[in-house]
Amino acid sequence: MAPKAAEKKPAGKKPAEKAPAEKLPKAEKKITKEGGSEKKKKKSKKNIETYKIYIFKVLKQVHPDIGISGKAMGIMNSFINDIFEKLAQESSRLARYNKKPTITSREIQTAVRLVLPGELSKHAVSEGTKAVTKFTSS
């Protein structure tokens, strides 16, 4: 009869010890799941990167009294994304041709000259050079 009593005591202690330990992680898991779902919703909203703010700032610098519609803003945003993608492809192609592992400001400048036409490329190069010198000086 002594072995039965010995078996009952550890068995009685183990479930009593496990039950509170199991309940705490379950409660913690529920909190993390609820918090995780809220964080996921916030992350999906934050991941949308647009240039709308910057387009609007430039518009107000050029024409302070003129607004822009949502469709026009979407078109401008896709236009900027398209131009950046073309510049990135061209600069990466130039780096590959020259057997260089990195894209420097020189590749970007050459890509701008190749992608953008005429006077627009000249203005873009001068503004880019000005921005790079301002960045390196500070």
Swiss-Prot record:
Keywords: Acetylation, Chromosome, DNA-binding, Isopeptide bond, Methylation, Nucleosome core, Nucleus, Ubl conjugation. One of its GO terms (molecular function) is DNA binding. The keyword Iron-sulfur does not apply. GO terms for cellular component: nucleosome; nucleus. It comes from the Eukaryota. Residues 1-38 have a biased composition (Basic and acidic residues). Gene3D superfamilies: Histone, subunit A. The modification N6-methyllysine is found at residue 4. It is found in: Nucleus; Chromosome. The nucleosome is a histone octamer containing two molecules each of H2A, H2B, H3 and H4 assembled in one H3-H4 heterotetramer and two H2A-H2B heterodimers. The octamer wraps approximately 147 bp of DNA. Belongs to the histone H2B family. This is Histone H2B.8. It comes from Arabidopsis thaliana.
